[in-house]
């Protein structure tokens, strides 16, 4: 097998549900080293031996890759810094306006960006199958996406529902 240099990760929104899951996954994979954790407020405790910081150039300097699962406002803070430092970024944040989506496309001309409303294999397979079904059925069928969430869901429709809607 190939020997790879470890990927130095910066994880934004480290106290959020997805941030916590990414930390857990990255710690269990020897190919990753978490070098930076950020949050939108001062945090006075260490997480996996790292004191979270705010989104600053200094915070992201050691990272090869930034993983962002936050909110649109924060994502653009991070994108601005990532662009300046020429850092790769994975964006799992959802809820962007059309104008914001276009701005992300502009940033993608300067730095590598991987963006998806849902990163799971199952949902991406469902997306692919939805596109096939939609093409097969044609315009003679009306398709709708319905979703139900817990009361704390921050964005609705969800990024997943929007992805499926585009596939239809």
Where are these regions (language model features)?
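N-terminal Rossmann-like NAD(P) cofactor-binding module of classical short-chain dehydrogenase/reductase
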Residues: 66-67
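Short, Lys/Arg-enriched N-terminal segments with co-localized hydrophobic residues
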Residues: 1-3
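Short acidic low-complexity segments
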Residues: 49-63
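NAD(P)-binding Rossmann-fold cofactor-contacting core
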Residues: 27-47
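Extreme N-terminal starter segment of soluble prokaryotic enzymes
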Residues: 5-9
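N-terminal Rossmann NAD(P)H-binding glycine-rich loop of SDR-like oxidoreductase domains
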Residues: 12-23
């Amino acid at each position: 097998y190939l020997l790879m240099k470890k990927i130095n990760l910066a994880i934004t929104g480290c106290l959020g549900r997805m941030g916590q899951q990414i930390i857990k996954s990255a710690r269990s994979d020897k190919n990753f080293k978490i070098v930076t954790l950020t949050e939108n407020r001062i945090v006075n405790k260490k997480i996996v031996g790292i004191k979270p910081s705010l989104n600053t150039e200094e915070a992201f300097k050691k990272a090869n890759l930034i993983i962002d699962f936050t909110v649109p406002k924060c994502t653009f803070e991070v994108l601005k810094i990532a662009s300046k430092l020429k850092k790769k970024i994975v964006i799992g944040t959802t809820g962007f306006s059309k104008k914001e989506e276009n701005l992300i496309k502009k940033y993608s001309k300067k730095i590598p960006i991987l963006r998806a409303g849902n990163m799971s294999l199952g949902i991406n397979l469902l997306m692919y199958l939805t596109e096939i079904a939609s093409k097969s059925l044609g315009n003679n069928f009306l398709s709708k996406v319905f979703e139900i969430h817990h009361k704390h869901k921050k964005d609705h429709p969800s990024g997943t529902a929007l992805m499926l809607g585009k596939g239809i």
